[in-house]
């Protein structure tokens, strides 16, 4: 069915309040969009970080009288009479199909493919991870996930134990298992991530070799041959004492979620205990790898 879209421009600080106003005026969904395509850096715990200049977009049923909507919004103290906005009629499309059409199998390194469930597997002889795009957790499309997958693909993981610190969807742990690891351990602070990882592991037939823990439940003295953490630079620095003890002596460490401009400070946090490799960059992001001394 067709829809009507109303777009407001505001500051990040006011975006949530205007989102509520749009919903009260009859919007069926809300989208926040960066006005200037600038990156959002890591939020503080409990904080919803938005851009300084944010578009708030409300989607309305095609039968909605937008004059009434505008009249309601004009009563809001952040808007007032004659507030700037843009109303656009959206053409009737199969939005779910269009969304699905945007996702294709992706290759990482020499052996590894990440494939949505509705696509044909390009190479039956390759290492194929079946993973559908989701709203919250990694699916391989972000440069940091790509950097980690390429790194794992280049390792000999046969018989190894791998820890995925901040596992999200479980994509890195599952890829490691598919690439030959004997066991993987996923750790995440979000119970929804633990469930997503469990579901994806079952879908890929590796759930019997994947252990999943919230930090409070993880075993003491846990060790692995390979540790990968695709989180953010701030947590990587703060958690360096914890992450650094996870690899065995001579074990490998892979870190991402790091902007290139943050690489030096993250390297400094790990240099004492690891022999670090040259930093690898992709777009504005980078990967740091090393071996435990």
Swiss-Prot record:
Keyword Membrane on entry: no
Domain of life: Bacteria
EC number, UniProt record: 2.1.1.-
Keywords: Cytoplasm, Methyltransferase, S-adenosyl-L-methionine, Transferase
A GO biological-process term: methylation
Disulphide bond pairs: none
Pfam families: PrmA
Reaction(s) this enzyme catalyzes, per UniProt: L-lysyl-[protein] + 3 S-adenosyl-L-methionine = N(6),N(6),N(6)-trimethyl-L-lysyl-[protein] + 3 S-adenosyl-L-homocysteine + 3 H(+)
A GO molecular function held by the record: protein-lysine N-methyltransferase activity
GO cellular component: cytosol
Localization of this protein: Cytoplasm
Binding site for S-adenosyl-L-methionine: 145, 166, 188, 230
Record has Cytoplasm as a keyword: yes
Function: Methylates ribosomal protein L11.
UniProt family annotation: Belongs to the methyltransferase superfamily. PrmA family.
Name of the protein this chain belongs to: Ribosomal protein L11 methyltransferase
Species the sequence originates in: Salmonella heidelberg (strain SL476)
Source lineage: Bacteria, Pseudomonadati, Pseudomonadota, Gammaproteobacteria, Enterobacterales
């Amino acid at each position: 069915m067709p829809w009507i879209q109303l777009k407001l421009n505001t500051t990040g600080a006011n975006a949530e309040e205007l989102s509520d106003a749009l919903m009260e005026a009859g919007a069926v969904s809300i989208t926040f969009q960066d006005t200037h395509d600038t990156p959002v850096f890591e939020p503080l715990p409990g904080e919803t970080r938005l851009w300084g200049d944010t578009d708030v977009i409300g989607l309305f049923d095609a039968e909605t009288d937008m004059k009434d909507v505008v009249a309601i919004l004009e009563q809001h103290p952040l808007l007032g009479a004659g507030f700037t906005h843009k109303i656009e009629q959206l053409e009737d499309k199969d939005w779910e199909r269009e969304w699905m059409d945007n996702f294709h199998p992706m290759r990482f390194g020499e052996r590894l493919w990440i494939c949505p469930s509705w696509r044909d597997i390009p190479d039956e002889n390759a290492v194929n991870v079946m993973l559908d795009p989701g709203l919250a957790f990694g699916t391989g499309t972000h440069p940091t996930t790509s950097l980690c997958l390429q790194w794992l693909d280049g390792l000999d993981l046969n018989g190894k134990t791998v820890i995925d610190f901040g596992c999200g969807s479980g994509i890195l742990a599952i890829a490691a298992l598919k690439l030959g690891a004997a066991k993987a351990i996923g750790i995440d602070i979000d119970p929804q991530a633990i469930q997503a990882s469990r579901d994806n592991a079952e879908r890929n037939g590796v759930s019997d070799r994947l252990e999943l823990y919230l930090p409070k439940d993880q075993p003491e003295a846990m060790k692995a041959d390979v540790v990968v953490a695709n989180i953010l630079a701030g947590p990587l620095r703060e958690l360096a004492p914890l992450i650094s003890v996870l690899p065995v002596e001579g074990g490998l460490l892979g870190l991402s979620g790091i902007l290139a401009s943050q690489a030096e400070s993250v390297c400094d946090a790990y240099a004492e205990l690891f022999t670090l490799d040259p930093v690898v960059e992709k777009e504005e992001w980078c990967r740091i790898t090393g071996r435990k001394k």
